Amino acid sequence: MTEVATVKAATPHNTKGDLFSSFNVEDFEIPRGRDEEWRFISLRRLRGLHNGEFAPATTSDVTVEIPADAESASHEVVAKDDARLGRAGAPVDRVAAQAWTSKEQGNVVTFAKNSHNPTPVTITVTGKGEGVTSFGAISIEVEAGADAIVALRYVGSGTHADNVEFIVGDNARLTVITDTHWNDDAVHLSNQLAQLGRDATLRHTVATFGGEVVRIVPRVRFTAPGGDAEMLGVYFADDGQYFEQRLLVDHAVPNCRSNVLYKGALQGDKNSDKPDARTCWVGDVLIRSNAHGTDTYEANRSLVLTEGARADAIPNLEIETGQIVGAGHAATVGRFDDEHVFYLQARGIPAEEARRLIVRGFFNEVINKVPVDSIREELDNRVSSELAVLGM
């Protein structure tokens, strides 16, 4: 007997930049494993975030540290319906909409017009542990002419989903480092939406080393000419870990620039009973018909260090106009280049040290772009700690 399933028709859209969006979780179908947006992740590992069967909801634990040399930075805990939340756009998937619907409050960090804030403001989200599910919303606004650095850190254990938005005003500059430094039993799904004004600059870095399942979905929208977005990422997955990065850069106006570079590594232990390490990177860049003068490039590189680990990489570039400066994309998944190891060995460097140098050099292309010395050093140390597991 053939079983026929009745499926609600998808909301029509022309491009990935026009996906159906809503703040109401009930407007989304429950994801299925064969859905394009969810086909790589194991829905069983999401602890009910995707279908509403999660542990009791609770407010997220958020602390904000503003340094003394910040010229004009403020933090407010606001009501869930505060008008400053959600300005960058509505969720485009059910988990993000669940986080929006279930949150009890939000956090708003504002950098005033023309202010100079050279030291990072640190936002720390701490997991609430077992038996509950935390939901949150964070809005970071850099007003016109201001510059700011934000370190967004996730630590501890638990199940967490949130919406984070970045409003970057005209001639403003924001550098943000998202560091998912969870314990290895955490599950975290995050939507991160950025809205850039005229001649605005965003430097967005995601570092993913901790957590059991971590899915980060950054989306960038240019609203006026002259915008510049650099999207960087580093990740290192071990047995039992699944990391997914799924991003979109939407060039909807003329004369904007974007550069995307993510690098990751995976390793495992043949004696482990945990699932093999797995990562997924999906990078979408959309150049709309009126986005003349666009200059964009995206790349993902993954190193598989042991048998069994798996990395998926899918770059997508959609171009609706030929009047651009340049556009390109690339993705590679590979192992050590033995020729590089032999080259270093020929110069007296032992094989294990040679491999360590190659991997650290691989990551340094991204890590060295982080403008905060302490964060850059911490990320480099984490790579070294991961390699120590392999005896490198």
Task: Give, region by region, the residue ranges found by the protein language model.
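N-terminal amphipathic, basic helical "cap/leader" segment at the start of enzyme domains
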Residues: 1-101, 105-107, 112-113, 117, ...
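Conserved beta-strand/loop scaffold segments within soluble protein domains that form the structured core
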Residues: 86-349, 363, 367-392
